Amino acid sequence: MLEIKNLSVSVDGIDIINNLNLKITKGKKVAIMGPNGSGKSTLSNIIAGKEGYRINQGEIIFNDQNILELDPEERAASGIYLAFQYPVEIPGIANSSFLRTALNSIRKYNGQDPLDTRAFLDECKLVSEKLGLDKSFLSCLLYTSPSPRDVEE
């Protein structure tokens, strides 16, 4: 669960987020929408732990812990990642590499062994079946150069 309590944030003395309260329960899907400059990116960056923001007040509770007390690396290890909507395409690097690295970081933090490529792909298949995702979605995950952004949106 993610809960934001009375969060106020500023950048360079300019208030960006004022007294935000939000509760997202496990399994719930939420879209944060708003016009340019309304604080969507600021909120994402604050949750991920990006520097340059002043937290004037409030808490961000993730899995019963105030993550504002954690380094970005500790937040990532707890399962919080910030990924681009349109990731930079690097020839030869698939989205699956990013996802496997992220998962293995969490596994390491939890004292588990990392998954090799085969085990990771098997896990992806199990999860996609559990979620009822089309097999073409998983196939697109493995592409290295064709634009995967169409699937990620």
State where each predicted segment sits.
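ABC ATPase NBD Q-loop/coupling interface
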Residues: E59-R75
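Conserved hydrophobic segment flanking the Walker A/P-loop of ABC-type ATPase nucleotide-binding domains
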Residues: I24-K26
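Short coil-to-beta microelement around the adenine-binding A-loop and adjacent beta1/P-loop entry
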Residues: I14-D15, E74
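Helix-to-loop junction immediately C-terminal to a conserved catalytic motif
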Residues: A48
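Q-loop/switch helix immediately C-terminal to the Walker
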Residues: L82, Y86, G92-K108, F120-E123
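Single conserved hydrophobic/aromatic residue that forms the stacking wall/gate
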Residues: C140-E153
